[in-house]
Amino acid sequence: EFIEQDAVVTISATQEDAPWGLARISSQEPGGTTYTYDDSAGTGTCAYIIDTGIYTNHTDFGGRAKFLKNFAGDGQDTDGNGHGTHVAGTVGGTTYGVAKKTSLFAVKVLDANGQGSNSGVIAGMDFVTKDASSQNCPKGVVVNMSLGGPSSSAVNRAAAEITSAGLFLAVAAGNEATDASSSSPASEESACTVGATDKTDTLAEYSNFGSVVDLLAPGTDIKSTWNDGRTKIISGTSMASPHVAGLGAYFLGLGQKVQGLCDYMVEKGLKDVIQSVPSDTANVLINNGEGSA
């Protein structure tokens, strides 16, 4: 007789006719329509969405979304814009999400026009840093910031505090087709900064770039949840970042640690498959390691 090391058996799930971004991150090649993922799907994780709020009653959230706090100063504890609901859907929607079993938390810092102040954004960030330990997230916490403004040491400092508290932070690189080092929180080194790609595996023409960009993810023509209870297709690095936040929750659910998670995604990502990427920008498309072709 012999005794062999017991292996952990996991269940692989598939979603047919998935949004192209989900299919892309579980495939080696573009053009697929199936999202393949481990059925753990972010169980035991939480995802903070620092944005315009979330329409928490959207059926695609299955009761997993909660409105926590409003720092936008508008007194409206919901999503008056749609942006935050869309982002949340990509992180953790049942149909449109990367991590379909994560818990979603809305921290509102932008109003119905998608605007907010640095002080409000920083207050929301500080709230997340302090609140995370009080939530039931045994496998870990991710934070998504699909927003940005001019370079700000105060915003970057608040972002660094999120990561030093042991939370994974994904941020949009920005949509100015310029170097992301000139905006915040994209320029914060400890954040995982995300540029956008399109269906043809090309860097989106609007995407910011540069040495502060860590990863690339689908961002153009992304279908997700909207604040009217329906769906909408929109584009931006705002849509790319939640693919990374969702993948962060997915990997945490599988037992990865927050420490070094952005580097782990770089390691697991597809290298040099995206066209039109400047030489000083990481050409790494995120991948969950599940898809075969």
Swiss-Prot record:
Q: Which residues form the Peptidase S8 domain?
A: 19-293
Query: What are its GO biological-process terms?
Result: proteolysis
Q: How does activity depend on temperature?
A: Thermostable.
S-S pairs: 46-137, 192-262
Q: Which residues form the propeptide?
A: 1-12
Swiss-Prot/TrEMBL keywords: Disulfide bond, Hydrolase, Protease, Serine protease
Q: Where is the active site?
A: 51, 83, 238
- Which top EC class is given? hydrolase
Q: Which domain of life is it from?
A: Eukaryota
A GO molecular-function descriptor:
serine-type endopeptidase activity
Q: Name one Pfam family in it.
A: Peptidase_S8
Q: What is its EC number?
A: 3.4.21.-
**Record flagged with keyword Disulfide bond:** yes
Q: Which CDD domains does this chain map to?
A: Peptidases_S8_PCSK9_ProteinaseK_like
What family does this chain come from, according to its entry?
A: Belongs to the peptidase S8 family.
What is the documented function of this protein? Serine proteinase.
Q: What is this protein called?
A: Proteinase T
* Organism of origin: Parengyodontium album
Name of the gene encoding the protein in the UniProt record:
PROT
